Amino acid sequence: MIIDVNTPISSRLDKYLKRLYPLLTQGVIEKALRQKQITVNAQKAEASLRVKGGDKIFINDKFNLPVKQPEKLVFTDAEIKLAKKITTDYLIYADDNLIAINKPAGLATQGGTKINLSIDSALKYLNYKGADFKLVHRLDKKTSGLLLIAKNYLSSVKLHNAFKEKLVVKTYFAVTYGKPIKNVGEVRSNIEKSKGSTPKITDIDSENGKLAITYYKVLKSLDNNLFLIEFTPVTGRMHQLRLHAKLLGCPILGDDKYGNKEIMPYSKYMFLHANNICLSEKIFGQESKLEAKLPFYFTRRLT
């Protein structure tokens, strides 16, 4: 059997084979490569070899692909219900490459400790039903707004690269307690994140952490020393906007991790919303501008 590699983006041989044949294990692949049951361009290959469009993978006809059936996945009623909402109620935009949803606050993007329901777990149900959705970025559980989901592997690679190359511009709205000294400005810091610890600001000249850059603009003065601020992150560090708001002296309303509970008004919700995303035409051939409506509690606070 001959497989013509059709992806324009290089991929490790073992990962490429696993996408085609999910039942193939790493051990089986490496053994087949050692025995030349699987070759690339008629040459012996390593599992780490990167294959790309134009390459040919040869699989010996006598090589037995695994025939056992995968275990039946079990999904909860909540995951099935959420999967339906992702493709209906939460859906903002869809094309051949991606979908964009308006994630509500309180819903996790990915699973974790004490998290039983997430966007990712619902996508697994949709993929079980024949889709090929892949997360390409995340929002904090308490953050609402625009979340992009790739429709296939190639689109996910393009979007991952686009985020790295700064071809995706995201804009957030936040209600903060207090305001920066300047109404328009830029925040630069290092953000350090150790495994199992909460992200923290470190000195810009420190060797610890990674550089984080955020632009901001004060849009409106509200009551009770609250302000509406627009944040545009240049980098994408964990909790970046929440930490930078705190660094500016104006923590986000409802942020119980980085805010000052003793002086800030109590809020059930955290007022941080991913409002706009602009995708450069360099990603999929045309520029796309997407917007997610503010949640009801956010709109009510602004009036």
UniProtKB/Swiss-Prot annotation:
Residues 11-70 form the S4 RNA-binding domain. CDD domains: PseudoU_synth_RluA_like (cd02869), S4 (cd00165). It comes from the Bacteria. The keyword RNA-binding applies. It catalyses: uridine(955/2504/2580) in 23S rRNA = pseudouridine(955/2504/2580) in 23S rRNA. Transmembrane segments: none annotated. PROSITE patterns: PSI_RLU (PS01129), S4 (PS50889). One of its GO terms (molecular function) is 23S rRNA pseudouridine(955/2504/2580) synthase activity. The active site is at residue 140. Belongs to the pseudouridine synthase RluA family. PANTHER family: MITOCHONDRIAL RNA PSEUDOURIDINE SYNTHASE, PSEUDOURIDYLATE SYNTHASE RPUSD4, MITOCHONDRIAL. This is Ribosomal large subunit pseudouridine synthase C.
